[in-house]
A protein has these predicted regions:
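Acidic-glycine-rich active-site phosphate/pyrophosphate-binding loop
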Residues: 26-43
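FAD-binding core of FAD-dependent oxidoreductases
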Residues: 52-62
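Polybasic, low-complexity association/targeting segments
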Residues: 1-14
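Transmembrane alpha-helix interface/packing and boundary motifs in multi-pass membrane proteins
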Residues: 44-52
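Short helix-capping/linker segments at secondary-structure and domain boundaries
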Residues: 29-32, 68-73
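DPxDG-like acidic metal-binding loop motif
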Residues: 60-70
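Amphipathic alpha-helical interface segments
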Residues: 19-28, 64, 75-120
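Short helix-coil transition sites and intra-membrane helix breaks within transmembrane domains
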Residues: 14-16, 51-53
């Protein structure tokens, strides 16, 4: 695990959700202050608001990529294309390493929605 992964793990153990931990660990690259980063990523934890859908760590990676290499001009078709390609590549690499980008699959959970606690 690299420096950013170790930092994200430490932040997660301090109580931040997966998305917050990833985004906060890249603050030197994103330029976001901790409060802004934590608030921005707060709803993505637990696989999107504890719905156990897209993994919060994956969402955090996508936010970092968007800040670093995303597009802002809605008419920038090439920027959109390259951003989406980069997101798809990140997702593919994460799937290969972890088997899925879906929170409940990563955690092996099968409980009904809304019954999870963060420690699970």
């Amino acid at each position: 695990m690299g420096e950013y992964g170790k930092r994200a793990e430490q932040l997660f153990m301090e109580g931040y959700n997966c998305s917050q931990a990833v985004l906060l660990s890249y603050s030197d690259i994103t330029g976001l202050d901790d409060k802004t980063a934590a608030m921005l990523a707060s709803g993505f934890g637990g696989g999107m608001g504890r719905m156990r859908e897209v993994c919060g760590a994956v969402s955090g990676m996508f936010i970092v990529l968007g800040i670093v290499a995303g597009y802002s001009d809605p008419s920038d078709a090439q920027g959109k294309k390259s951003t989406y390609a980069a997101i798809q590549e990140l997702a593919s690499r994460f799937r290969k390493e972890n088997g899925s980008i879906i929170c409940k699959e990563l955690l092996g959970l099968s409980k009904p929605e809304g019954t999870y606690i963060p420690a699970e």
